[in-house]
């Protein structure tokens, strides 16, 4: 399964094309719209979310509520585009109109300046429009399709925020994926410890008043994953490496860890490795899950536990200093619409890209043209592993 996305932040629409989805998968627009709505939610979101109410249109690859095996095309309209018709026009326009909302003051931490250098733009809006987090709308849409595949195979996925701007959220032990999903989706800030809810909201309000932004850490958990996804035979076949690349590809994400992650560097091997157990009902299990569900780049049957760190949003209402690319004079950076934090929304994006990578790996290992063959192949593999 592979996909491409296209579209600009203030262009007419966003598009994704997905190839390789098996035939026979039940899929409707509502399966996708629910996740698009979640992406637009979360405490601390700004004005753009009040303008856009994302709804997907499926224009190929689905007939009578089921996938056909053909490429699936998804579209989401940008309602805000009506205010940007001249600025984002495809055809050539008058020079005086081209300078409307022209950007020459690059924002520190954004793609503005380097994109302008790379592609030789004199208007940095060209960098801004495609590098905007608005692009993640389609990665969430693609991820929703991937999650439909996972659901048919009894694989669950959820996300929650574990750090807000340096404030760690205590997480109850031994929560199931279903419990994490339920608790996080009941929270406006996607945390499972609701005793911290108001404290974090007040903190977000304070940051907004100061014209600043905060980052944090999001955790995604995947349960019910078959043993043996990924491989140790080559560097680029390890599934944890593929997930890491997908997570760090999300706008503003700067790091990733699995299980105990960077804490491993402070511990001994006897404190980290997951002891192997066996029982007749479940087959092989682990006493702990310190490695986050991976051994040798392969899933080991334990839940995948992956965390991604998101830097503070670079667009500040009290902008940092920059330089005008035309005059080289110092200026305050350009201010575009922004939020004090987007961690709850970023969690939805992270969940989506992880789901896409896992679904793709399943389709790679259990290559099937249709859903029934896929389900049979996965069930047979699970039986084999249980009796190994």
From Swiss-Prot:
Record carries keyword Nucleotidyltransferase: no
Catalytic activity line of the entry: 5-O-(1-carboxyvinyl)-3-phosphoshikimate = chorismate + phosphate
GO biological process: amino acid biosynthetic process; aromatic amino acid family biosynthetic process; chorismate biosynthetic process
Cofactor detail note: Reduced FMN (FMNH(2)).
Subunit details: Homotetramer.
Binding positions for FMN per the UniProt entry: 130-132, 251-252, 296, 311-315, 337
GO CC terms in record: cytosol
SUPFAM superfamilies xrefs: Chorismate synthase, AroC
Cofactor (UniProt): FMNH2
GO MF assignments: chorismate synthase activity; FMN binding
HAMAP family xref list: Chorismate_synth
Entry keyword set: Amino-acid biosynthesis, Aromatic amino acid biosynthesis, FAD, Flavoprotein, FMN, Lyase, NADP
Chain residues that bind NADP(+): 39, 45
Name of the protein in question: Chorismate synthase
Similarity section: Belongs to the chorismate synthase family.
Organism: Streptococcus thermophilus (strain ATCC BAA-250 / LMG 18311)
